[in-house]
Design a protein with these regions (language model features):
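Extracellular attachment/recognition segments
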Residues: 669
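Bacterial Sec-dependent N-terminal signal peptides
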Residues: 1-18
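ATP-dependent phospho-/nucleotidyl transfer catalytic cores
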Residues: 443
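Beta-strand-rich recognition domains
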Residues: 656-662
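Accessory carbohydrate-recognition regions in carbohydrate-active enzymes
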Residues: 16-334, 338-382, 386-438, 446, ...
Length: 715
């Protein structure tokens, strides 16, 4: 029987639509533009350098992307934005249609916006103009259609304007002709030394008049004709910006560029095809897929040149990437990438290795070629290790050198780790020692795995021992990870609910949330509790207990179920820990609750910052029933899929299908599993089995079962 879905599509025709490239219709780019989502709204293509979209005045933390649904004032259409971050930056090379050169902002209504992947439009009143935006990887394309009452077609080019921390320090229009403007904008912000060069071309002759304060008035010759603006960007030079533009947008067919952007999105969205009768979940899913591909961003020009982490220009034989929010994305976004974007991985690995060679360590949080050192731990290590262990890195020795050297530095608390075997809270001036120590431990486990793979036994032993340092912070008396002093005493008093942002032993969290940050050795953590029963009792309590975190708690602690904070990344693996102790049904119930309550088809549809794709990647993986808990190596824990079928295109013409029989909101519990037609009792599946292609068939029911309970079947 064929089940008819909302909108008139059947499950059969949905699959056909996926293959014919119609998935962009299921994307709602407004999800996450309100609340604390901090999501970019505008025109871009998958993993593009350019994110062309509206910029509003920076009014606080919720404007980190330059846009928030609560606002109705525009100050420009900038060519670069961040998505889902907790710090604002970029906003480079902004244009604004104006009545005259004195105008610096425009009111707008969300009712007059039209947005879909690769396209943004808005109708403005003062001036009366229809603004349309689209983009390629390295160029933006704008079309301004002025109303019949318009006296002039005028734009202001603003090179001083930026978002959040961004402050322009050097900018100019360096060259103009009758139809072109070229220049640069150098800024200091979250990215300490960002260089942006641009080359803009207009569809009709223009005059360019400097207004001062980084603003230029551009007046077109004919107000009765649409004014089109094509702008190439580069971090290397204006000449490269021109090359990028000539290569990617050689003509003036705006509709074709929109169609090409739509096709690019459809191609990538079709990496996962789902079948479901729930139209809302379908929109949430494909919007989540869309959000996972805003970054990493291409950061090399069409001629291969890119600006390195040392500020020098390099000729690369690979695609270089930036916007590496690794503390967030090592958990789900990159493991998802290793499943459906395998073609990107060799270049991604080359990016990491070359960043190491240029700055002396792997990236921590890289933005526009700049190391921001934002967040804690060594998050570049698990991402690179995962690519090595999964077979996508040719230069394994170079990758290992980068990991080892990064783990053996003395900065950011690692010197204390080498001296004491942990990070004493009384010796680390920047605080957050428990969070740092736990992150270093899981990264060390990844170094150990690669060392063992390469036959480096002594190194493997050393880093395996260091990866056990998490046990030093565990206080068996209270059952929490706690700050430890240099003389071996736990910090007192112990209030596991308390959270003092940037001033205690945790990063954007508390003891309840950080006690579980041992994804690389869950069984070792269980032993610290004494036995599985005590571990489960504590884990059960996590989702029930409530308490006051205090006035200075981080706003990132959000999306709470008890003290489980889905709105922030350190919690993202925790639900799956039940599989490790033979109780996958508890994970299933909580997974369904989280998928249902923390993701909505609404502008306020995310429970926390989108964090450059991580929040959405969790949804993508968990909704199809898989999650890589251990940071590297490819062990994907099986959860509770919400779709009747998910088809993952894993490359080389192969697909991995996840089929759920008897699935419904009530039938959330796995009863039995078959892998390629044969009974499968394990509550996890290995990466290599996924990438071979095949079918994982799950029989679902409304009661817990014995599936996955035996010790031999646990992760």
């Amino acid at each position: 029987m064929t089940c008819v879905l909302a909108g008139g599509y059947s499950q059969v025709s949905l699959a056909q639509q996926a293959k014919s490239g119609k998935l962009t219709q299921f994307v709602n780019p407004r999800i996450g533009t309100g609340g604390h989502g901090h999501v970019f709204l505008g025109a871009n293509v998958p993993f593009g350098y350019v994110q062309l979209g509206p910029t509003e005045p920076s009014r606080g933390w919720d404007w980190c992307s330059g846009y928030h649904h609560s606002d109705s004032i525009l100050i420009g259409f900038g060519h670069q934005h961040l998505s889902g971050t907790g710090i604002g930056d970029l906003g480079d090379v902004a244009f604004l249609p104006v009545v005259d050169g004195n105008q610096k902002q425009i009111k707008f209504s969300h009712d007059n916006e039209n947005v879909r992947p690769g396209y943004y439009a808005v109708k403005l009143q003062q001036p009366n103009v229809w603004v349309e935006l689209t983009a390629t990887q390295r160029a933006g394309f704008q079309r301004y259609t002025f109303g019949a009452d318009a006296q002039q077609a005028q734009l202001v080019l603003d090179l001083k304007q930026g978002i959040g921390w961004d402050a322009a320090k050097d900018f100019n229009v360096d060259n103009t002709t009758a139809t072109t403007v070229a220049g640069h904008r150098f800024s200091k912000g979250w990215a300490n030394d960002q260089k942006a060069f641009f080359f803009a071309e207009f569809s009709q002759p223009v005059t360019v008049k400097p207004l001062g304060a980084g603003r230029w008035l551009i007046t077109a010759a004919d107000v009765t004709k649409p004014l089109l603006v094509k702008t190439g960007l580069s971090a290397v030079s204006a000449e490269n910006a021109k090359l990028n533009l000539e290569k990617e947008i050689p003509g003036w067919d705006f509709r074709q560029v929109v169609a090409d952007a739509d096709a690019a999105w459809n191609k990538e969205l079709a990496k996962v095809n789902i079948e479901t009768s729930d139209s809302t979940s379908r929109r949430i899913f494909y919007t989540a897929m869309y959000h996972t591909m805003t970054a990493p961003s291409v950061f090399s020009d069409v001629n291969g040149q890119y600006r390195g982490a040392d500020g020098k220009v390099y000729d690369g034989n690979f695609t270089n990437y930036t916007t590496l929010s690794l503390w967030d994305t090592y958990r789900a976004a990159h493991p998802l990438m290793t499943m459906i974007h395998t073609d990107m991985l060799p270049d991604m690995a080359s990016t990491f290795i070359n960043i190491y060679r240029q700055q002396g360590k792997l990236p921590v949080w890289h933005l526009m070629g700049n190391e921001t050192n934002c967040m804690v731990g060594n998050p570049g290590i698990p991402v690179l290790a995962d690519m090595v262990l999964k077979g996508y890195v040719k230069d394994k020795e170079g990758a290992y050198e980068a990991m080892k050297k990064s783990a053996m530095l003395d900065e950011r608390g690692m010197g204390l780790l080498k001296k004491y075997g942990y990070l004493p809270y009384d010796k680390e001036p920047t605080k957050e020692t428990v969070a740092k120590g736990l992150e270093y431990a899981l990264a060390d486990a990844c170094v150990a795995k690669v060392a063992r793979m390469l036959g480096k036994k002594e190194d493997a032993k050393y880093f395996e021992n260091r990866s056990k340092a998490y046990s030093k912070y565990f206080d068996k008396e209270t059952g929490f990870m706690r700050g430890l002093s240099s003389d071996g005493k736990y910090r007192v008093p112990c209030n596991p609910f308390s959270a003092e942002h940037r001033a205690d032993d945790y990063t954007e969290g508390n003891a309840w949330q950080y006690t579980w940050l041992v994804p690389h050795d869950v069984h070792g953590l269980v032993k610290l509790f004494g036995n599985e029963k005590k571990f489960v009792t504590k884990l059960d309590s996590l989702f029930i207990v409530t308490g006051e975190m205090g006035a200075n708690a981080s706003p990132d602690i959000s999306g709470l179920i008890g003290q489980y904070a889905h709105g922030n990344e350190p919690s993202h693996h925790v639900l799956y820990m039940y599989n490790y102790v033979g109780q996958p049904w508890k994970a299933a119930r909580l997974l369904r609750q989280t998928l249902d309550e923390m993701y909505k088809d609404d502008f306020d549809g995310l429970s926390g910052n989108e964090d450059v794709g991580q929040m959405s990647a969790w949804y993508v993986l968990s909704s199809v029933g898989l999650y890589q808990v251990e940071p590297a190596g490819g062990k994907y824990v099986i959860g509770s899929p919400i779709f009747d079928k998910a088809e993952l295109n894993v490359g080389k013409g192969k697909t991995f299908n996840i089929v759920c029989k008897n699935n419904s909101k009530e039938n959330m519990y796995v009863q039995s599993v078959k892998l390629n037609g044969k009974p499968y009792s394990k509550s996890y599946i290995m990466y290599n089995d996924i990438m071979k292609g095949g079918t994982l068939e799950l029989q679902m029911g409304n009661q817990p079962s014995k599936w996955g309970t035996r010790p031999a079947d646990r992760p």
